[in-house]
Amino acid sequence: MSETPTDQSPQRMSTRNQARVNYTDMAAGNNSVEKEPVFRSPTASTRGRKKRAANVDVADLSASFGNLNNFSTPPKRGRPRGGGLGSARGGRAPMVRRTTTEESAEVDDRELVAAVKSGKKITEAVDRWIGRYNEKFLVAIAEMHQFFFAICGCKGIVTPQMSATLTYKDIICRMTEDFEEDSADYPLVHGGSLKKVRANLHNFIHTLIIRTKASMLFDSNLMDGFVQLLTGMADSQVRAFRHTATFCAMKITSALVDVTIELTQSKEKTSKQIEAEKAKLKNNSAGNEKYEALVAQRTQTEERAEEIRQIIGYLFRSVFVHRYRDVVPDIRCICIQELGHWMDVYPEHFVEDSYLKYIGWSMFDKVGDVRQRCIRALIPLFEKTLILDKLELFVNKFKDRLVSMLLDKDLETSIETVHLMRVLYTVFPTLLTIKDVVPIYELIYASNRPLAVAAGMFLNTKVFRSAEKPGKAPTAANIPLVKDLTTFFIEGDLHQHATYLVDALFESNPIVKDWATMGELLINDQYQLDSNFETKLIEILTCSVVQSATGEPPVGRHIVKKGAPSAKESRDLVEDRQRLTETLIPLIPRLITKFSSDNEKIINLVNIPLHFQLETYLSARMQTHLMELMEGLDSLIEKHLDEELLKAVAELYYHLTTNSSISALVEGHKMKLLDGVAAFIRKSMQQFDDDQMGEEEEALFVSYIKRMAAFAGFMDLRHWDLWDILLKVVSNYTREDTQRDVRERSMQMLFMQLCFDSMNIKKEGETPKADQVRKLKKRRDQLIRIVTETLNEEACGVEQAYLVICDLMILFGSQLAEESKALEPLIWRPDAMVLGNLKIFLDVNVFDVSNLDDMDQQEKIEVMHKMRQHVAQYAKLIIHGAMPVAEASHLIKRYQSHFQDFGDIFKNLLSKCREISFVETGVMICETLKTLYSQLDEDQGTDPLSESFNSIRDLAKRLGPAFGVDYAKNRFAISSLHKKAIDFAFEEYDKENHQMPKNIFFLEIAIEFSGKLLAQDKMAVVRYLNKIYTNRVGTSTVVWEPYRLYLGSLSDRNDDDNMSVRSGMTVTSNATMRSTASSTRGRGRGRGRSRIADDF
């Protein structure tokens, strides 16, 4: 096997007396912007591939190359010199070449293209090409030219004769003619098997430059040709040429920048050696050959570095300057990304205002990817302290634009801009004003988590730079920082939920996990915190505990992460939970005692123990704190009547008693507490029966009912046997001031007891005992009687009665028969009157409410929450099968009028109905539209041009997507809808008087669903329409316009042609309608005639 070819210049005729291309002079022709002021806004965009200015015309450039041979330049040391190559936009000077018969053969670029497309053996392919260049350099050059065209997707052939005799402009024109239309999806943008071509092409170009940097890189026949060809291709009107050539030119420039850096470092090393040799020569008057060799080596290195810089400058002005505003966004991205790379690796040369201005101008680009690359290019520059003075003018010029990009509509750009602002603040602390950083503070509460985290990192850099790692004891250095954090939350007044602030800082700021310091601030009175400050600090503490224990971000900030947490994340979660447990167990009882009179603070504090590792209470030292916690909870039960607080305490009791490790320590305490509450309720009812209940006793009775109701939602209260007492309360309690509270809480407790009884029956065995079923059925009927009477009479507590009825319909639905035959007697099928009362309640209390505008903001929010709960409760009945899909019509007919308030519920209901039955959903939608149409006819008559009729048509249009995009899957649902529509349109038609059917205009509404039909199903609908028309209309020659419009919508034409408007409609008659049942659609041959939907 032959050895890998070395990088040596081919043995050919010397060209030492021939001048090489002077890139400096060439670039000067294009450097029209150099004389303009720095950062002047660019002139009109050249993205539309306009012609260059006259001073860079291809003919002039070609002429400048044609006379290069007339100049004689002294040869330079150490390498052969080639002839100057012409411009891609003009002629080139004829090169002195050694022609051989072998060089006339056609080139074969398959090896290079295959290597780039596959990404395999790229280095070997480059080495073999270098070997061919050393043997037959003209063929190798043509092969490389062919490669650049082939990688663009062009199938044209470049021969050595073309490469040697034609100008680059002519070669590009010929390749443009050979570029086929089907090659538009060129490799650089192709997906699939070619998705890695971009990375492979970058690797190929980098390898080529590195393997030739010793000598061949400075051969004019090689590099000058590449530069001119790529420059011409980058100016082509063919997008594939322009895109690929720009990519290659920019990657070549990046590789040349790396070579320049290497040469510069070599020169500095040689200079140090020269200084060392100079010191030796002071004591030796004789010559020093090593010194002279070093000087000669430095001179050669300087010359080579200068030549490379000239090529870089020429490529920049001939390609970058024209392509950074190209019409193709990815071309602009390539230019900016590579410019950022040059600035990063070679700031001494590129971090100048003449280059930075292109970054600044591109920050105004309309495409987010381009703006994002501008920001990414700037971030590493501000981390280099030696060049900060060069960035000062740029920052002052474009600071306002950077601040505005904080709110960029492209999220990735906004995130990168926040990171840039953080780095910018680090190096220029006085640059950003308060007005500039306020948008960053607002982003801490953004719904996008990466953006909020980036804003949190900025806040850390600006405020919390000196935070210390928290421990189990308070940290004195963190006390002022915790105060600053709380003050920031209060003064920001941007959001009322601290959980978003905590989440933004959770991973980057240790302050949010310094629970010991927070507790010290709250307990110790020497810090003199005001009440609002304490409330906000407790909220921050609670949110931090919840996220540390669960690892879950707040609602709306879900982490898009696949798979289970890593081992480190799981370990950190366990360690954080253990630390917060040991830190807060002694503090929580003291905090509850201190703030026992403040509802808002106590609710947050009571939630904290839910996230403890309860096994920690088993130690003797911690059991004391558990008893303190129980005593504190008892005091809260005695002091407070707030429903939310009572539920929080009851939940904590339930959480503690259901944990097997400590339940024995807590169960007795809980039983004692509830025994006292139940005993007082019995005593109060006895007073009520004896008519001895005064106002004070009445208030106490209501308070104990509320306390017991809070516990009823979390635990089974059958031990206290309150069923009969609560029934009596609901039936007989009539005191006006407290009747509503008492009746609602009592109904709630009765229902929850039914739930626990039902669950207990299913747990006790496979076949429930008959007496247990009878007892449960008796209780169920008792509760049903009470709540249905309440709903029917609209008595006090009607809202709770509505909720209980809906839940009872689900709890005792038909699914019980599937669980066990013995449970069939428990199934409840409400009669029509009950269902009608549910609809009436919904209309009166939700859809017909008109006084919302008169309420204040908080009251309006509470009322709307309650209304949404009622609508969702009705939707649950359909979703869980307690009512048929057809009953959804009562909600769907409000789809358009109440979409703003209940749209999400309506959409979810439609989706679930479709999952239950496509056909029933189609019929339900048709019934909904029929109901609205009938109401329209009763109110004002049917006018198809009226606003009311158009609103029904718009509703039909909005309900169309409910069927999904799979027409084959929902074909029978759509067909059923059309059948119902046709039947309704010709309903009650009297053929004697030939009057237009009163419902005929309903066909115009059904037109909105014609586009959902398959072609063969349209024929079935047409046949059914003709049959109904013939049977009911008879031989009448009258053809009504709605009929004609509907028939036209069923003809075989594009869906876009099915117009909903009445004007301008050309209807195809039945005789001329084309049959398409046997036509083929899509690719390939037909697979036989599809089964047409049943002819109804």
Curated annotation (Swiss-Prot):
Name the species this protein comes from.
Answer: Caenorhabditis elegans
Does the keyword field hold Metal-binding? no
Name recorded for this polypeptide: Cohesin subunit scc-3
Any single GO molecular-function term of the entry would be: chromatin binding
Biased composition, class Polar residues, residue ranges: 1-21, 1060-1073
Task: Using the UniProt record, give the first listed, main subcellular location.
Answer: nucleus
Q: Where is this region: Disordered?
A: 1-53, 67-106, 1057-1096
Write out the function statement from the record: Component of the cohesin complex, a complex required for the cohesion of sister chromatids after DNA replication. The cohesin complex apparently forms a large proteinaceous ring within which sister chromatids can be trapped. At anaphase, the scc-1 subunit of the complex is cleaved and dissociates from chromatin, allowing sister chromatids to segregate. The cohesin complex may also play a role in spindle pole assembly during mitosis. Plays an essential role in cell division during embryonic development.
Q: Where, per UniProt, does this protein localize?
A: Nucleus; Chromosome
Q: Name the gene that codes for it.
A: scc-3
